UniProtKB/Swiss-Prot annotation:
The lineage of its organism: Eukaryota, Viridiplantae, Streptophyta, Embryophyta, Tracheophyta. The chain crosses the membrane at residues 194-214. It comes from the Eukaryota. This is Wax ester synthase/diacylglycerol acyltransferase 3. Bifunctional wax ester synthase/diacylglycerol acyltransferase. Involved in cuticular wax biosynthesis. GO terms for molecular function: diacylglycerol O-acyltransferase activity; long-chain-alcohol O-fatty-acyltransferase activity. In the N-terminal section; belongs to the long-chain O-acyltransferase family.
């Protein structure tokens, strides 16, 4: 049985959260019409799906959370609040009546089903989540659960924690999944150099933050990315969304990480830069635009990267995450940084990873994401929500794509007694034509693309370029490792 807290403790918490609660500043942005954001996720199972078991599990976990049993009510002044309502789980868990025997290509069917779900508006008059269960065998799973959550419910860390709270170890059905904690800003300075090192570190943080905030201001005012086949027009609404994913080996990413002494995020950003470079180079070849290909290295192409602002990124038990004072806060506690992408042809594929690490090291010295989060709250309080929406909209209008990486479970888990094979997820919304998400699960990493098909008509080709770029980078890293051993 999957439960959270019981008895008096649970009753007390329900009383405390039963009142109407205002949305957080970031959640307010996600419900605005111009930045309407939601998350599409897919859980692949190793067995056939039992809908009644999942419905019972949802009743014992998800519905205990105030946000999953509340609707969003927007007042005339634009302020939104969570309003508790009674929830019938069966209305949110959908089991479509399909003739699976007539489905010739299950993988294509799931892709179309997911994309259709992404293009269907959510019913704002009820809690903003739904879960679709399909007993269809694909190349990577025996059955699937496809969910759609409004982004106001929580960020990637919150929803991964919800997944873990709904799961148990496959090796030990009574044990909750565990993951390693990631501490930030650990210091190894010796005491004798502590003051000098600390002072110099603070100077670097202040200088880097000022520079990055100045670039942020320029972007909000007028600095826009170069027009490329990846970028939509300013002010355009997304016409039609398509969601696709591809599963690759996480071990390949770890091999590059270890051989180059990098972080996983550095490798993923490096392969993204390499993949985008390949895609744009081919596009300019096809269009016979010689001048544009020559100027490929002069392109300004930037991504908005969501940064988790929690001090401790351990995926804690969901009940602890909801508790006041928890180190790991539930909800949308994220900041946004602007990440310049290295887009050009390189003879050495490892240069893409080195450039990614170099840029990320600078970003790690800056606290722009935390300051911007605070400025959103302050601006909303002083000038109102419309001003914040306009500024954030301009940020996404003036950049090309969004990138994020979410570390999932590092061991096999069962979701309400269903052993899982993979997790895929994409956040959609806003004016950008391309959103790239990476989600890890044990020894797999899932590349997720959400695109505006009126701008990017061949998302599978772009996905191929990302996969091939990882292969090329891996081979180069292996060769580098061999040279190191010889030396």
């Amino acid at each position: 049985m999957y439960t959270m807290k019981k008895g008096k403790d649970m009753a007390k918490e329900e009383q405390e959260t039963a009142a109407i609660e205002p949305l957080s500043p970031v959640s307010q942005l996600f419900v605005s019409p111009s930045l309407y954001c939601f998350i599409i996720f897919t859980l692949g199972f190793q067995t056939r799906c039992n809908p009644s078991t999942i419905v019972e599990g949802v009743k014992n976990t998800w519905i205990k959370l105030p946000r999953f049993s509340s609707k969003v009510e927007i007042k005339k002044n634009g302020k939104a609040s969570w309003v508790p309502v009674s929830v019938r789980v069966e209305d949110h868990v959908v089991v479509p009546d399909l003739d699976y025997s007539n489905i010739e290509n299950p993988d294509q069917f799931i892709e179309d089903y997911t994309s259709k779900l992404a293009n269907t508006p959510m019913d704002m008059s009820r809690p903003l989540w739904e879960l679709h269960l399909l007993n269809i065998k694909t190349s990577n799973a025996e059955s699937l659960a496809i969910g759609k959550f409004h982004h106001s419910l929580g960020d990637g860390m919150s929803l991964i924690s919800l997944l873990l709270a709904s799961s148990r170890k496959t090796s030990d059905p009574d044990a909750l999944p565990t993951t390693a904690a990631t501490r930030k800003h650990a210091s190894s300075n010796k005491k004798s150099w502590w003051l000098v090192g600390r002072f110099w570190f603070m100077i670097r943080i202040i200088f880097t933050t000022v520079v990055e905030l100045f670039k942020y201001l320029l972007t909000l005012c007028f600095m826009r990315d170069t027009k490329t086949p990846l970028m939509g027009k300013t002010g355009d609404a997304i016409r039609s969304r398509k969601v696709i994913h591809r599963i690759v080996s996480f071990d390949d990413v770890k091999l590059v990480k270890n051989n180059m002494d990098m972080k996983v995020n550095d490798v993923l950003l490096g392969m993204t830069q390499a993949g985008l470079s390949r895609y744009l180079s081919r596009k300019y070849d096809e269009d016979m635009v010689v001048e544009k290909k020559k100027n490929l290295e002069k392109i300004r192409l930037r991504g908005t990267v969501f940064v988790n602002l929690r001090a401790d990124t351990k995926l804690e038990d969901l009940a602890n995450m909801m508790a006041k004072g928890s180190k790991c806060r539930w909800g949308n506690f994220v900041g946004v940084i602007i990440f310049p992408l290295w887009v050009r042809s390189e003879d050495d594929p490892l240069e893409y990873v080195r450039r990614a690490k170099s840029t990320m090291d600078i970003k790690k010295l800056s606290i722009e994401s935390l300051i911007c989060y605070g400025l959103i709250k302050l601006t909303r309080k002083i000038l109102g929500g419309k001003v914040v929406e306009t500024l954030v909209r301009r940020l996404f209008d003036h950049t090309t794509l969004t990138f994020s990486n979410v570390m999932g479970p590092d061991e096999d888990i069962s979701f309400f007694d269903h052993p899982m094979s993979y997790v895929a997820a994409s956040a959609l919304g806003g004016p950008q034509a391309l959103i790239i998400h990476y989600v890890t699960y044990v020894n797999k990493i899932v590349i997720n693309l959400a695109v505006d098909t009126s701008v990017i008509r061949d998302p599978h080709l772009l996905c191929d370029d990302l996969v091939e770029s990882l292969d090329i980078i891996k081979l180069a890293a292996m060769e580098k490792g061999v040279h190191k051993m010889e030396v």
